[in-house]
Amino acid sequence: MSFASNATGFRIPLTTCVYPSPILRFNAKVGSGSSYGTTEAQRNMKCVDGIGRSRVVAVAASGRTRDSNPEVESEKMKEMIRWMFRDMDDGEVSVSAYDTAWVALVEDIGGSGGPQFPTSLDWISDNQLDDGSWGDRKFVLYDRILNTLACVVALTTWKLHPHKCEKGLKFIRENIEKLDNEDEELMLVGFEVALPSLIDLAKKLGIEISDDSPCIKNIYAKRDSKLKEIPMDLLHKEPTSLLFSLEGMEGLDWEKLLTLRSEGSFLSSPSSTAYALQHTKDELCLDYLLKPVNKFNGGVPSTYPVDMFEHLWAVDRLQRLGISRYFQVEIGECLDYTFRYWTNEGISWARYTNIKDSDDTSMGFRLLRLHGYDISIDAFKAFEKGGEFWCMAGQMGHAVTGVYNLYRASQLMFPQEHILLDARNFSANFLHHKRLTNAIVDKWIISKDLPAEVGYALDVPFYASLPRLEARFFLEQYGGDDDVWIGKTLYRMLYVNSNTYLELAKLDYKHCQSVHQLEWKSMQKWYTDCNLGEFGLSEISLLLAYYIAASTAFEPEKSGERLPWATTIILVETIASQQLSNEQKREFVNEFENGSTINNRNGGRYKPRSRLVDVLINAITLVAQGRGISQQLSNAWQKWLKTWEGGGHQGEAEARLLIHTLHLSSGLDESSFSHPKYQQLLEVTSKVCHQLRLFQNRKVYDAQGCTSRLVTGTTFQTEAGMQELVKLVFPKTSDDMTSATKQSFFNIARSFYYTAYCHEGAIDSHIDKVLFEKIV
């Protein structure tokens, strides 16, 4: 383990400094945000990604603040995020020019002959880009061609803005042949059906769009093939994903279809619902469309509402970025909202959508179970068919992100939850294959680094994922407001993908890292002053012990837990590594017992003959300082020493010692130790840690540097033990202990799992990354 340097050339400081104190306090200091760029269509702050927004919301979406004082900026960003969560309703999502065009095509159902939604035509007029196209600021030709043709058709239908139409047509004619060169992974949902429908509409209006090129002929062929596969009888009988893309389809029985709408919409699709309104003049369809038209100043998103999607993914981003602790109230409200609409069939992207999908269900299940909600696994049964798990009925293929979220959810299984075991096996195999074939590209999102996200999940599973390690990697993987989603058109979720989240997370991480680096220097000073190197303890082991503690109890105010955790690991390793006879071990234990008894009685006048015993007693005294727990800590150490002397299960004894040390250090009353739940947690955790310590001595690694599977008999027991621990830790019960106390058991087990699971080289790189690499 090359701990002295990292990939960037930074050398870990080896100079001495203050003795490690179990109580170090630092004020939170965080830094500034970044600026936000708008497209030409958004000039003069008319809108942000097509949404009419106030300056406050625009800043909140972008992460830009004006103050240079880091602490003030940090608080402003936290307040922005709280405001964003309070503002969550049916979803802050960018406007789709394509869907807006279909809405604009609707003729007044009152019979005036004019447009039903004139403000939608205004939106189209106001949002043409300088090159003549309409669409997202990220240039994807599928998106620009579809949006532009739809807007030209809408404006031409109402004989408006011929110069804008001509400019749009010029863009289409110059670029449509280039579709042949586009990456098919970026093709929009239903593009091969939507584009021919628009071309046919354009022809009826006298708009000439060449359809005899090989490129367009190929798209028409795909359209014809897909339409032949659509079971028209099924389309009219029950809700399916086909309802999302009705626009342009012919031969529909609207009387039957209207029975399948939910809250006035067809699968929350404005364009599909607008097409239905054109043909039926249905009042419920009209009422549905008025909501987004009014909210977004004439424009409409490609999907609306997206409330479940927004609530869940926003919480997930805060958690993975390591800043969720600042927003516990807001997160609780989001999850209460989700739980209110949970069903045994799962959930969807919107609360009233009448078909469910495994992607939103997986994310909802994972977050609800993590936060103690009583949540059923029955929903996953609806998505399993023939050994595979599908996002929704009728799906033609698997999306990487959907399977990725299924994989993450499956890792929170309780014992005997076989459907989640099946889901984990399927999703893990699918994702491993995608990685091996370099095919981690998703059909739902264009994100900064999806392969790295999936890679981390495979290499460092939930049981091994230390909180600070996950945050450090996700800071590099999360694209903020540059991430864009793929639907019928490209779209953005302003409260899911936000530079405000990213900037606050970076600044928070930098502050935590600076605290950890100061503590690491003090640990080195303590190591030198105690001459621990003479007892065979290397600085590598010292660093690993501190890293494990700092990556778990990472918050600056938790130095009173980090330092006792690290020193306990270090002293256990140092003592256990001594080559002592049985008699020498007995003398060591006796001397500790005598020394700690005298010290506890008369204030520390006893000087033991063994320097290592002296180091141990002094460490206990420092941890106990000002807390009145010296005797309790000594008792905990005596139990571990007795196990060490007798050659008992070291991993189990170490876990018990570590748990008691952390709980005493954090102020937990010793009376809690006799709580039945505490005893149960202690028993399961200590056994799991013992099994992991045994496994650590005979693990086999794969090419990625982590064990590809836990394969020994002991390890199968470990997996069962971890499942039992998850069941004990995360659910909330009426006679329960605090969630923080229960979580600490899982944290200890996770630290053992991490060191057993990951290769030394991987751990080495993690240490450099978490503690020493600078955040850019």
UniProtKB/Swiss-Prot annotation:
It is an enzyme of class 4 (lyase). GO terms for molecular function: magnesium ion binding; terpene synthase activity. Gene3D superfamilies: 1.50.10.160, Farnesyl Diphosphate Synthase, Terpene synthase, N-terminal domain. Residues 1-60 form a transit peptide. Substrate binds at K226, K443. It is found in: Plastid, Chloroplast. The gene is CPS4. This is Ent-8-alpha-hydroxylabd-13-en-15-yl diphosphate synthase CPS4, chloroplastic. GO terms for biological process: gibberellin biosynthetic process. It comes from Salvia miltiorrhiza. Its cofactor is Mg(2+). InterPro entries: Isoprenoid_synthase_dom_sf, Terpene_synth_N, Terpene_synth_N_sf, Terpene_synthase-like, Terpenoid_cyclase/PrenylTrfase. It holds the Pfam family Terpene_synth. The Asp-Xaa-Asp-Asp (DXDD) motif is important for the catalytic activity, presumably through binding to Mg(2+). GO terms for cellular component: chloroplast.
